[in-house]
Swiss-Prot record:
Organism: Pseudoalteromonas atlantica (strain T6c / ATCC BAA-1087)
Cellular localization per UniProt: Cytoplasm
Name listed for the protein in its UniProt record: Arginine--tRNA ligase
Uppermost EC category: ligase
Keyword Nucleotide-binding in annotation: yes
GO function terms (MF aspect): arginine-tRNA ligase activity; ATP binding
E.C. number: 6.1.1.19
Name of the gene encoding the protein in the UniProt record: argS
Lineage of source species: Bacteria, Pseudomonadati, Pseudomonadota, Gammaproteobacteria, Alteromonadales
Length: 578
């Protein structure tokens, strides 16, 4: 049950009933202040000019027309024409009882769509670094939310497994193998290997010439070069899988659709663009000109799909990927998660793809850009020496720091239990620190803030969950079977109840906008409201009537269930003890 949608539909029907034009604005929002109801409808002001009536008079008519019997206990016109909606405690209690009895918290699935999500997509032959964190975890959170709501999700890990850089890498690996090194040993540290090859390419003319020859051979399908190339791919994918496992994301080998997968189709893409009069020759290259994106002087943007020497570009591969996803995978919607610096490229790519008919009018194509992770100096996050931070090393440090923090707290956990706990807290802290920020903005990386047990952090939410679970242990009850009749007599009980029912609104916003921070904010607000409820509405004290105790226990169980569900969508583990 979606509370926002239910109320919105009721008010839209009421607007039609009072003579408002169809599709009139129907702004419905959550109340921002205690004492002004649970929701607020602000549609009267926008209709004043259209209906030639005072906003308050229109609001009064809406109140008379809207059918909320049994749902709202009171509607109140306030100010110039706001309508404050006070939901019925009995109705809220009934909805919570349905949620308590349902593993899905009484959340209905959406009509199924096929959604392709392109995320993570690291360049192979290098180790994953912190620059891959945001695309990987934001993409995975969106994927899990989509699947939770019933959509068919096709993950596409568009790995960079092709390109001219492989020439120097293959030449360097070939030299290593000829000196009797085993491939796995030579490639044990991909960063060092890449650095060695780059130095040789820049400083040894003979090596650079051989590297260029290897590029030509690789693109020509030479069996020896392909075998060397496959060594890089296998080692790199294994490394990526280890990172995905540490991060608790759902990507597997089956989701890989690297750049090389489209090699066979690149010539066809260019030919089709030429046949449709889109790609034309310019200085020997094949270019699609885009007057829609002209510069200040009126020069159209140039989108190159084939170099003058015959080589193809990332743009060509991206077009082939779009065509494959829409024509073969039949995507209703495609999401691509990359950093904001690629926004113009994907804007141009969509424009070309739509002109070419690679995207049908009813298919949506959305680039979801994100900002950068910054260090304390406000610059892109680097090591102290200015190098790239390996993602696996960052995650290992997070776990070590979490273990150090936990060792300073009083606990009866064993050493092994402490290590398991540190892993959940450390990894969760890194992920949540990122996911809780609006993806379109840059954010500053801080160990102290992300590992804090106070504020909007993963440790705080994980602790809130363990605190709820400790109530059930002390009471000797199984939280999974709790479904007592709920009463909402205390203000804190009702506020918590309304927040429980807003969970699906947060999930839907994540799906619609690709913004997991909305879910993070919701979970933090839920946990904070539970703490207020816990202080004001005791469950374990003597003298509390059994029906009141059971009602509050059921509310607590619902909170635990919602926290665990929401954190699992973010790929963050919960624990029953801390």
């Amino acid at each position: 049950m979606n509370l926002h949608t239910l109320l919105l539909n009721k008010f839209r029907t009421a607007l039609v009933a009072i003579g408002a034009p169809e599709n009139s604005p129907a702004p419905l929002s959550r109340a921002t202040k205690v004492g002004f109801g649970d929701y607020q409808f602000n549609g009267a002001m926008a209709l004043a000019k259209v209906l030639k009536q005072k906003p308050r008079d229109i609001a009064e008519k809406i109140v008379e027309a809207v059918e909320l019997d049994g749902i709202a206990e009171k509607l109140e016109v306030a100010g110039p024409g706001f309508i404050n909606i006070y939901l019925s405690k009995e109705w809220l209690a009934a909805q919570l009882s349905h949620a308590a009895a349902d593993p899905r918290l009484n959340i209905e699935s959406q009509p199924t769509k096929t959604v392709v999500v392109d995320y993570s997509s690291p360049n192979l032959a290098k180790e994953m670094h912190v620059g891959h964190l945001r695309t990987t975890i934001i993409g995975d959170a969106v994927v899990k939310a989509l699947e939770f709501m019933g959509h068919k999700v096709i993950r596409q890990n568009h790995m960079g497994d092709w390109g001219t850089q492989f020439g120097m890498l293959l030449a360097h690996l070939n030299d290593k193998l000829e000196s009797n090194q085993v491939a796995e040993t030579a490639l044990s540290d991909l960063e060092d290997f890449y650095r060695e090859a780059k130095v040789r390419f820049d400083e040894e003319e003979g090596f650079a010439d051989r590297a260029r020859e290897y590029v030509v051979k690789l693109q020509g399908g030479d069996s020896h070069c392909l075998a060397l190339w496959q060594n890089f791919i296998d080692v790199s994918i294994t490394h990526s899988e280890e990172v995905y496992h540490k991060l608790n994301v759902s990507l597997t080998r089956d989701d890989i659709m690297g750049e090389s997968a489209y090699n066979h189709d690149l010539a066809n893409v260019v030919s089709e663009l030429q046949a449709k009069g889109l790609a034309v020759e310019s200085q020997g290259a094949q270019v699609v000109f885009l007057p829609e994106l002209a510069d200040k002087e009126g020069n159209p943007a140039a989108y190159i799909v084939q170099k003058s020497g015959g080589g193809y570009l990332y743009a060509t591969t991206d077009l082939a990927a779009i065509r494959h996803r829409n024509k073969q995978l039949h995507a209703d919607r495609t999401l691509i998660l990359t950093d904001a610096r690629q926004a113009l490229h994907f804007k141009q790519t969509e424009l070309v793809a739509r002109k070419a008919g690679f995207i049908e009018p009813e298919q949506t194509y959305e680039h979801c850009p994100f900002g950068m992770m910054l260090g304390n100096d406000g610059r892109p996050f680097k090591t102290r020496t200015g190098g790239t931070v390996k993602l696996v090393e960052l995650l290992d440090e997070a776990v070590e720091r979490a273990e150090t923090l936990l060792s300073k707290r009083e606990t009866d956990l064993s050493s092994d239990e402490l290590k398991v706990l540190a892993n959940k807290i450390g990894i969760g802290a890194v992920k949540y620190a990122d996911l809780s920020k609006n993806r379109t903005t840059d954010y500053m990386f801080s160990w102290d803030s992300m590992l804090s047990f106070e504020g909007n952090t993963a440790p705080y939410l994980q602790y809130a969950y363990t605190r709820v679970m400790s109530i059930f242990r002390k009471a000797g009850v199984d939280h999974q079977t709790l479904n007592a009749p709920i009463s909402l007599d205390a203000p804190q009980e009702k506020i918590l109840a309304v927040k429980q029912l807003q969970y699906v609104e947060a999930i839907n916003q994540v799906i619609a906008e690709g913004t997991p921070h909305v879910l993070c904010t919701y979970l933090y607000e839920l946990a904070s409201l539970f703490m207020s409820f816990y202080e004001a509405c005791p469950m374990l004290k003597d003298g509390i009537e059994q029906d009141v105790r059971d009602s509050r226990m059921t509310l607590a169980a619902l909170t635990a269930k919602t926290l665990q569900s929401g954190l699992s969508l973010l790929g963050i583990d919960t624990m029953e003890r801390m």
